[in-house]
């Protein structure tokens, strides 16, 4: 199939959140399965510092009474063709800035639609989050191009001002809607990034005022778990950690713990229960819950804590103050560093992720991959990726709690701290987590099933068919 990914982010060149990880990784694995997948991305002003971009565009067009140019390159580290939407409105900016994001990304989306109609015509346009929400509306009347819309985080639905209804030729019955709602209504298929989150957003507690619409279209709504690049993030050969290891050489992992304690200024003690967290410091991630119990937890136990992340200034200040109260037992790094995050995954005993809500989550999969036992709240993708430790039946991969309450989190952390004392059971718990399959190839197969379901095609066999055969099947289904 010919598939065009349209998004505001794509790792490693333009990333703010999890959407960038998906758009930067999934196309690579879909191409390995025989599909012609390409990415359409804004030409941000900072991109020339990160990659090679030709000076001359491959195509020029106009949208919303503005001219634009499209430049062709390749996503670094892959063979995925990358089309960059060039216009001055994106050049001097960060990815998200200013109060005109609705106009900028609607203009970008209109440009992507014009590009698909006039230059490279895909079978499917795969749209990501509110920034691309108008594309399914415009493509709804085109029998040759279908759309898939992925909701990465329903909480961000995008602004929408009245004048956009006029210059985008928005149907009268969509007036007043945001672009997220428009995409949900008009896309051929809608998916979220985990099965549990797909169910949760149909309820008032998680639906962000769209639960009625999402329930109405539930027949075309599904959830597919994100993946991680298991070739890049592999404790067996990761050059950023002190000691590589596998499930068979788990005892070697202790060297990473000692190296991490030395690096971040914690007391070097291999027997201390070391908890890590790599996150954005925002309410969604349960930071308010952590702040309510962390002082008590560190006072009650001999545990250590290391945090890596940035976010709300209030949360940053509170974490700094806690670290100053527990020198040698708590380390706070208010930044993001990929290499340090890997050392935290590889060197901590447990990983804390008590999210208020979590569409999918990547960190818990990374922690499992590197043998750090996750402590999570049962919500969204955390339900689908972490199962509660059951020592009697030698089952489970982490410690889970249900209610978003300080006492519930505290109790769960105490159970993990106590479980850490039983080394044979703890190592078996680590091994089960490290053996889980969170590869992007697994996720890619689910997306292929979703794409094929649009055309009523049967599920693809394990050995992917040649692209030409599949393209012929898609063409026949349209005729």
UniProtKB/Swiss-Prot annotation:
Q: Where does ADP-alpha-D-glucose bind?
A: 15
Domain of life (superkingdom): Bacteria
Matching HAMAP family, A to Z? Glycogen_synth
In its UniProt entry, what is this protein called? Answer: Glycogen synthase
Q: In which pathway does it act?
A: Glycan biosynthesis; glycogen biosynthesis
Query: SUPFAM superfamilies, per this entry?
Result: UDP-Glycosyltransferase/glycogen phosphorylase
Q: What is this enzyme's EC?
A: 2.4.1.21
The organism is Nostoc punctiforme (strain ATCC 29133 / PCC 73102)
Family, per entry: Belongs to the glycosyltransferase 1 family. Bacterial/plant glycogen synthase subfamily.
What are its GO biological-process terms? glycogen biosynthetic process
Molecular function (GO) terms listed? alpha-1,4-glucan glucosyltransferase (ADP-glucose donor) activity; alpha-1,4-glucan glucosyltransferase (UDP-glucose donor) activity
- According to its UniProt entry, what is the function of this protein? Synthesizes alpha-1,4-glucan chains using ADP-glucose.
Task: Report keywords, A-Z.
Answer: Glycogen biosynthesis, Glycosyltransferase, Transferase
The UniProt entry, under PANTHER family, shows: ALPHA AMYLASE DOMAIN-CONTAINING PROTEIN, GRANULE-BOUND STARCH SYNTHASE 1, CHLOROPLASTIC/AMYLOPLASTIC
Concerning CDD domains, the annotation shows:
GT5_Glycogen_synthase_DULL1-like
Reaction(s) catalysed by this chain's protein = [(1->4)-alpha-D-glucosyl](n) + ADP-alpha-D-glucose = [(1->4)-alpha-D-glucosyl](n+1) + ADP + H(+)
